[in-house]
């Protein structure tokens, strides 16, 4: 068999309505983390948040809490699995 016969399934692209959580490693080393509070809230890493809108490389996320919606880079998000 050749290497091309083994394909790793690609994750589904994140889109409007997707449930997500923040990838801690990607977020903590980002410009967005530097511009925010030094200690991010734990709920963003636990999820789920819902993507409301996608524009370019960013997604607007709404959390199931009484907090404002936030814009985060899509590469900082990962799909939420129960």
Swiss-Prot record:
EC number: 7.1.1.-
Topology versus the membrane: Peripheral membrane protein
GO CC field: plasma membrane-derived thylakoid membrane
Catalyses which reaction(s): a plastoquinone + NADH + (n+1) H(+)(in) = a plastoquinol + NAD(+) + n H(+)(out); a plastoquinone + NADPH + (n+1) H(+)(in) = a plastoquinol + NADP(+) + n H(+)(out)
Gene Ontology molecular functions: oxidoreductase activity, acting on NAD(P)H, quinone or similar compound as acceptor; quinone binding
Main location: membrane
Pfam families attached to this UniProt entry: NdhO
Compartment annotation: Cellular thylakoid membrane
Span of the signal peptide: none
Keywords: Membrane, NAD, NADP, Plastoquinone, Quinone, Thylakoid, Translocase, Transport
The protein's role, per its UniProt record: NDH-1 shuttles electrons from an unknown electron donor, via FMN and iron-sulfur (Fe-S) centers, to quinones in the respiratory and/or the photosynthetic chain. The immediate electron acceptor for the enzyme in this species is believed to be plastoquinone. Couples the redox reaction to proton translocation, and thus conserves the redox energy in a proton gradient. Cyanobacterial NDH-1 also plays a role in inorganic carbon-concentration.
Family per record: Belongs to the complex I NdhO subunit family.
HAMAP family cross-referenced by the UniProt entry: NDH1_NDH1O
Protein name: NAD(P)H-quinone oxidoreductase subunit O
Species name: Prochlorococcus marinus (strain MIT 9211)
């Amino acid at each position: 068999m050749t290497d091309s016969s083994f394909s790793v399934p690609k994750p589904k692209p994140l889109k409007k309505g997707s449930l997500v959580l923040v990838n801690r490693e990607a977020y903590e080393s980002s410009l967005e983390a530097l511009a925010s509070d030094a200690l991010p809230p734990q709920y963003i890493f636990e999820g789920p948040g819902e993507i409301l809108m996608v524009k370019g490389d960013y997604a607007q996320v709404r959390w199931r809490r009484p907090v404002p919606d936030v814009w985060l880079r899509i590469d900082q998000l990962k799909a939420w699995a129960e």
